[in-house]
Amino acid sequence: MKDARGFLILWALIIFGAWIGLSVSKWQSGADEKGITTDTSAGEVVINFPEAPDEMPATWDVVFPEDAIPGEMVVHFTNRKDYQEYLRALIQAGLAPIGQIDELLVVRIGKDAMSGPSPGLFGGEGSFSYRVQRPLPPVAVAPEQYAQLRAFGESARSIVGGPVEGDGSGVLVGILDSGIETHPQFDDVYIVHIDLAGGGVAGPGAAHGTAVASIIAGSEGIAPAAELFVVRVLDDEGMGNSFHVAEGIVQAVDLGVDVLNMSLGVYQDTQLMREAIRYAEDHDVIMVAAAGNDGYTQMPYPAAYPQVLSVTAVDRVGRQALFPNQSSSIDFAAPGVGVLTAKENGGTMLFSGTSAAAPFVTGTLASILSSETECSHTEVVDLMRRTLDEAGAPGVDPVYGAGVVNWDRLRERETSTILDVALAEIYLPANALPGTTMPVEVIVQNRGTSWLTSSTLTVIVGKGEPVDFTIGTLGPGQTTTRKVYTQVPSIDSSDSLNIAARVVSEEPLDDVRLDNNTKAVFFRPIQK
């Protein structure tokens, strides 16, 4: 009897344990009683739809992630047959999708379609559409720090020093933004535009896109003869969604754009955005995006994708603008403080942010493409990389990325006799400990087109004696670093660390830019 009772108790425990395990499993996977499950193992929420008709709920009680667009989902299919059969099933049920991207086999559905045929019957897998926005204005920087930045106060064309290469003729540039307003700067520009955000291409809130477009192809822009394909994906408040961004990317690619500018972002990676970026990459489109103005140590998407050229902002003297996000995957640094651009009602305004910096790169690429017609898109990007000015820590760094765009070097690249040695940077790590001895790295760069055989670098720390270094052979674009060790002032000290340096070639009279041979900086610990 005891054995029978023990057996029954053991059996009951097994059944109870199995029930508990099933309940926990369903809760962890996000399952409801109707067979809809969610999976977050890939870093984003993926919806698994039921594959049997009787498992489909009449209504879906779905918990939408933060920043997801409520009341709608994105359904992905792996083949065109299933994709078309699902669309046909919706029509037969008297339903319709909110949107679809045929090239990506993606359907956007709302609440009404959620009560229709299960996408799982057709092999569909779901995800969410997320809020996308233009980079926020750089307001998080303390006013006293922001005041230290030096605004350009000039148009893009003046900043780059006139024509870079070609005028953009024959190049089609796509702009995904808040639309574009009529402005005298665009009187001679051929513009095709569509509105995916529903506010009208030139409706309220189009000022951001207008400023971006004027840097690229306005009469005061870098490539004034380029043609524009403007896709409005942001509303009058600068907000949009990742479905419209993906749709805009695909439409721009299908229209044949050469370069695509995206001064917008979202911090949620999605399958939909990845597929759209891959689609553009497969069609050899150069993509450029703003790194963002939030001061984070990560970048938003699409700038964070390796296929996209990400751009941070610098001020008039080449300093990082304090507000941009930081990442070692940043590709270029370009002007982004107080750039004079077009605005509504035919006027002009000072435009700041990585949203301003990105179109400098886009416009420059359009200019080069219109002149270097035999170069591939990859070769044109590599050409820009080879003429960047070193800044920040040696090599690629999270603040300046690979370097600052230098338009003079772009123009001079085919003149083989230019001598230009530059004092590129005096670098002390931001995490230098007050009161300790730390290395200061002094970076010299050959910004000319001829080889440097010998130069002399002189470094002065505080009131100390000058220290000389001999710089050997440097090829065009190459850099070299010398270190000096010094005491960093303590945290409670009012002293600052002053360092000055100068580099002189053995033929100083042949140096075309003596103004970049010297640099002086001071470091002061931040008082708590």
Please name every model-derived segment.
Residues 6-11, 21-22, 51-67, 93-102, ...:
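Protease zymogen maturation seam
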Residues 30-50, 54, 62, 253, ...:
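C-terminal subdomain of the subtilisin-like protease fold in secreted/lumenal serine endopeptidases
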Residues 162-168, 239-261, 270-287, 296-312, ...:
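Mature extracellular/periplasmic domains of secretome proteins
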Residues 162-173, 179-192, 200-243, 305-307, ...:
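Subtilisin-like serine protease catalytic core
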Residues 177, 292, 353:
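Active-site glycine-centered loops adjacent to acidic/histidine catalytic or metal-binding residues
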Residues 182, 191, 203, 313-355:
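Catalytic-core environment of secreted peptidases
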Residues 213-216, 233-234, 258, 322, ...:
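Hydrolase catalytic cores
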Residues 407-528:
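Extracellular/luminal regions of secreted and cell-surface proteins that mediate adhesion/ECM remodeling
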